[in-house]
Amino acid sequence: MDIISLGWAGVMTMFTFSLALVVWGRNGF
Protein backbone atom coordinates (compact mmCIF):
# COMPACT_ATOMS: atom_id res chain seq x y z
CA MET A 1 0.00 0.00 0.00
CA ASP A 2 1.45 3.35 -1.00
CA ILE A 3 1.12 6.64 0.88
CA ILE A 4 -1.55 7.95 -1.49
CA SER A 5 -4.03 5.13 -0.85
CA LEU A 6 -3.18 5.21 2.85
CA GLY A 7 -3.92 8.93 2.97
CA TRP A 8 -7.20 8.48 1.09
CA ALA A 9 -8.20 5.67 3.47
CA GLY A 10 -7.57 7.98 6.44
CA VAL A 11 -9.53 10.85 4.87
CA MET A 12 -12.51 8.66 4.03
CA THR A 13 -12.49 7.12 7.52
CA MET A 14 -12.45 10.52 9.22
CA PHE A 15 -15.18 11.82 6.86
CA THR A 16 -17.41 8.83 7.57
CA PHE A 17 -16.79 9.09 11.32
CA SER A 18 -17.57 12.82 11.48
CA LEU A 19 -20.67 12.33 9.31
CA ALA A 20 -21.87 9.59 11.67
CA LEU A 21 -21.34 11.90 14.67
CA VAL A 22 -23.44 14.62 12.99
CA VAL A 23 -26.24 12.14 12.25
CA TRP A 24 -26.20 10.80 15.82
CA GLY A 25 -26.18 14.35 17.19
CA ARG A 26 -29.23 15.33 15.13
CA ASN A 27 -31.03 12.18 16.29
CA GLY A 28 -30.43 13.24 19.90
CA PHE A 29 -28.06 10.36 20.64
UniProtKB/Swiss-Prot annotation:
It is a single-pass membrane protein. GO terms for molecular function: electron transporter, transferring electrons within cytochrome b6/f complex of photosystem II activity. InterPro entries: Cytochr_b6-f_cplx_su8_sf, Cytochrome_b6-f_cplx_su8. The chain crosses the membrane at residues 3-23. Its main location: plastid. GO terms for biological process: cytochrome complex assembly; photosynthesis. HAMAP family: Cytb6_f_PetN (MF_00395). Component of the cytochrome b6-f complex, which mediates electron transfer between photosystem II (PSII) and photosystem I (PSI), cyclic electron flow around PSI, and state transitions. The 4 large subunits of the cytochrome b6-f complex are cytochrome b6, subunit IV (17 kDa polypeptide, PetD), cytochrome f and the Rieske protein, while the 4 small subunits are PetG, PetL, PetM and PetN. The complex functions as a dimer. This is Cytochrome b6-f complex subunit 8. It comes from Thalassiosira pseudonana (Marine diatom). The gene is petN.
